[in-house]
A protein has these predicted regions:
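Extended beta-strand-rich architecture
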Residues: 1-225
């Protein structure tokens, strides 16, 4: 589909939250805080891939590249503030089964996600026609190809504008569903987000919860060896 895979550090901070329209204080309450962060201004683990992938797209655009379309596969970290506290254990002693269970219970959920951002031109000048900028339909096509490749029967559900998360254009975004199972979002980024990130107008994106998507499959995925 012409997208390039990228890897980004899974760290976020206030600037990332604000660019995507998130309330920083509310988001911090459900985010994993790093005790010794690599970057002082990004002391939290991401809850979505898009904010960290956006940083990579920004870097490419600032270096003069155009028509940047990247995707990333990776973990997100969904902290539950009501989860039990992780116990402090002494060193040099193997934890008991009960202590190991307590450690597991306190860990955040870490599903696999895939996210993509498409900017610039979807089609450049060619013998069949002129230039065409990226729009939401290109992100939808990417999602359909992912679903088709793994055999998931997705349906796009466009909610009322008030039910669309702040990072998405309220009239050009949809939930990605498999039956009654929510697996992600696809569409055009909100104009305010594109402006804050320095992206071209109408830049589009998607983010899918692959763990949830694979759980909807009735058979096991086939992998060639």
């Amino acid at each position: 589909f012409g997208m390039v895979e990228s890897l980004s550090y899974p760290f976020v901070g206030d600037d990332d939250y604000k660019a995507f329209g998130f309330d920083p204080e509310a988001t911090k309450k459900v985010s994993v805080e790093i005790a010794n962060p690599l970057y002082g201004d990004r002391p939290y683990l991401r809850r979505e891939i898009l904010p960290t992938l956006a940083t990579t797209v920004q870097r490419n655009i600032r270096r003069g590249l155009e028509n940047v379309s990247l995707y990333e596969l990776g973990h997100v970290y969904l902290w539950d503030p009501d989860a039990p506290s992780i116990p402090a254990l002494p060193g040099g002693v193997r934890p008991t089964d009960e202590q190991l269970a307590a450690l597991d219970a306190g860990l955040p959920e870490q599903p696999d996600h895939v996210a993509g951002i498409l900017t610039g031109l979807a089609e450049d000048d060619g013998w069949m026609g002129g230039k065409r900028p990226v729009d939401w339909s290109d992100a939808v096509e990417a999602v359909r190809r992912i679903a088709g490749r793994i055999g998931a029967a997705i349906v796009l559900d466009q909610p009322a504008a008030d039910d669309v998360p702040v990072q998405w254009h309220p009239g050009r975004a949809a939930r990605v569903m498999v039956g009654d199972v929510f697996t992600g979002w696809v569409g055009e980024l909100h104009p305010r987000v594109n402006e804050a990130l320095g992206f071209p107008a109408h830049s589009a994106a998607f983010e899918l919860n692959l763990t949830a998507l694979f759980a909807t499959l009735t058979g096991k995925p086939v992998q060639a060896k």
